[in-house]
Amino acid sequence: MNRAVESSNKALVLEAFDTLFNERDYVAAERYWSPHYIQHSAHIEPGRDGLFNLIKSVPATLKYEPGVIVADGDFVIVHGRFSGHGRPKSWIAADILRIVDGVLVEHWDGQGGETP
């Protein structure tokens, strides 16, 4: 895969995350997540609806700030920070996403509380 595609995939993930996590525009977010989205996270119910329902369940003050982002072919890894969710510590997450035809189709993650 060439760098232009990988750059496009990174931009897609950042736009998708901003649309869902910060703007909370669920209708617009549907265009980024496949209806057959595979969720491997132990913290999120299966599928696109599981992810969307999780975000609907946290306070509207939720904010996502992306950090390092890397692409390798159809995979994008983004390390970011979730705050404003009502818990004492921000969540730090490394999300791995697989993209097919410009849509997020699969997700894995690792996360923990922010440490000073």
Residue positions per predicted region:
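C-terminal and inter-domain tail/linker signature
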Residues: 1-116
